[in-house]
Amino acid sequence: MQIRYFLALSLLPQLVLADESPTASASQCVIEPPVPRIVSQPGLSAADQEKIRIVSDRSNAEMGKQAIFTGDVVFSQGDRHIAADEAILDQATEQFDANGNLVFQDNIFTVTADSLQAQMRSNRATLKGAQYWLHGQQVHGDAEKLQITMNNNLILTNTNFTTCPPDNVSWLLEAEKIKINSEEEWGEIWNAKLRIADIPVFYIPYMTVPVSDKRKTGFLYPSFSTSTTNGFEVSAPYYWNIAPEYDLTFTPNYMSSRGLFTKTEFRYLAGEAQSGRLNLEYLGNDQMLSGSPNRYLYNWQHQGAIDKNWRVLANFTEVSDNNYFNDLKSDVNRATDNQLSRIGEVSYFERNWDISTRVQDIKVLGEDEKPYQVMPQVNFNYRAADFWNNLDFGFNSELTNFAHDDSDMNTATRLHMAPSLTLPIHGPSGSLTSQVKLMQTNYWQEQNNSAFDGLDDTVSRTIPQVRINGQINFERFTELFDQNYRQTLEPQFQYLYVGYEDQRGIGIYDTAQLQDDYFGLFRDRRFSGLDRIADANQVTLGVTTRFFDDHNQEATKFSLGQILYLQDSKLGYEDNLFEQNQSTSVLAAELDTRLSHDWYLGAAIQYDTNSSNNKKTEVTLDFRPEANKLLQLSYRYVPDLLNSNTNDLVNISQAGVRGAWPINDSLYFVGNWYYDLNESRSIETYTGFQYESCCYAIRLSYHYRIKTNYDDNIGSAVIDEREQFESGVYLNLVIKGLGGSGPLGVSDMLNDGLFNYRKPLYLRN
């Protein structure tokens, strides 16, 4: 016999825990409860969701008194279900008791228990002898008593939990009491013991852990390392969730060879579209340096939009000494960074014009000669498409004041204006863009040193420019290595004329020579900045061919180009630094190709056809059979590269190998090795192993790298001896479920070092 009761009473509170979406890796670790899920009836109205439905084999009920249900009792209310052998409902006191093969389920978790006592009037319930499983996750455990309070919280007494599979419990947290706040989505734990491999390793009198991705104040995962530079090192970050729009991370970092190194990061949101970060780092009395100086860093970054038109940007960094990034692991810059950026900018944008004001001060570590400061620079740009008879009009201008910390250095104010007319012609088979520009620049220079007597107090420079750039697109279908391809042939040419004017009376404030890669051949200038505008009468010829497979994916791209100088640049006769008196530029070629489904080749060369010398070569060969498998070989050669620390010319000939490979489903290897062929020495070695299971992850890595040591500018007058190379061992451990999945990942291992995976030929800067 089946009897159904429909009551407008609420049995148990609805827990409001976060519905976390498991990651792809986590989905393979989901632990399902040993009892089947009770399927809710779909399409119920809001009123029906509140009704109680009881189904049983037998029942004995009298109105206003007890109702007794026996035999496969199923109690349902919306998404909540209770199954038991026997249940008693006291209608007078609104007490509901159930026992015998008891199962409680909702959309958050499943609980099996010996007995259940629920007070429907106060929305409280107690389950004894409980085992619980969180749906869609791997969190599960036991509790002597599990209480659901009237304010939607959970209290577990004499309990434990883990994220490991039941047949392989690598770690287990046992606690006297756990309280889970369903609204705040965090838990409090009292008198806890952490067992690893069933061995108690930690006693924790009190701790808090998040039960979702919601931010929560508390300690983050510690890390351990040892190195020849800092000795044994341990850090224990503490996270403070101040407010929804503010948070702070404080990291005490103890180094046995140096002392206590503290790092503080404050992050904030300002309105809907602005954000910023403030970093403070401090090491008092560095024991590794003579004089035990204090070392510090402070950095402020801010960016965002005030409204749809206004933009703001700020970035300011200061450090105590030249070797700060080289000696200490900063959260702001890497060891190879030797420039500190100090920039502030406010911009306003309209459809056809924009204006910005900018201040900039770049500090170069380890160099006595300091760059000029931009204090300030105002830019105004105007553009009008189809201004007249298909002509586009543009106007670019800037007003810059150059200052310097050294009072002996000359200073200057520069006004530059460049109106232009452009005729663009575009079609499916090619394009032709013609442009005329007039560049007017005025300087007002103040000389503070006799070494700059050759400079003029005022300079007015007017230079015309004509630029014609054209490209034609050819296409055909062809067969190569038994594969069908669609091939394009894209010849490109550019004629550039830039007038000449004597510029020896102008100082060098923000100008440097640009690199001559393939795309650089089609620039309209040889220098960054505006202090030198090289005269030109030249033609650039280039060609690009591409091969597309049957899926319209680019399989190969090859580009080749060179500049033909119709006359020597007169600017070279004024200053040997900018000399250009050859008939042609370097011959630049670039290749990117997919050799097969798994092999990829990238190469670039700059060859001087006048002197028959190789000016630059870069080659990378990648083997990527799957998303998580990589083997990369690289080589670069750069002759006569200026070492800014010694002002000497050096040749770079460097080979490298980088790999990332899973040994099995849980163990991953990442390593790299870079070798200096000229000096016959290794400049960086990195080896890392990472093991990750459903419930914990551990990484062990070894790092050996060359150091960039600068002259000391801190502490005593004694120049401290620094090792040319540094080596160290690093250990990271994450226990999943105690605060999230942790920071470990293969991608950051690939980029942990001097050389980036995507740009292995360049030092990170």
Swiss-Prot record:
One GO BP annotation of this record: lipopolysaccharide transport
Subcellular location: Cell outer membrane
One protein family per Pfam: LptD_N
TM segment ranges: none
Membrane as UniProt keyword: yes
InterPro entries the UniProt entry points to: LipoPS_assembly_LptD, LptD, LptD_C, OstA-like_N
The organism's place on the tree of life at top rank: Bacteria
Keyword line: Cell outer membrane, Membrane, Signal
Signal peptide: 1-18
Protein's UniProt keywords contain Signal: yes
GO cellular component, one term: cell outer membrane
Gene3D superfamilies registered for this protein in UniProt: Lipopolysaccharide (LPS) transport protein A like domain (2.60.450.10)
Task performed by this protein: Together with LptE, is involved in the assembly of lipopolysaccharide (LPS) at the surface of the outer membrane.
Assembly, per entry: Component of the lipopolysaccharide transport and assembly complex. Interacts with LptE and LptA.
Family stated for the protein in its record: Belongs to the LptD family.
Protein name: LPS-assembly protein LptD
Species, as recorded: Shewanella sp. (strain MR-4)
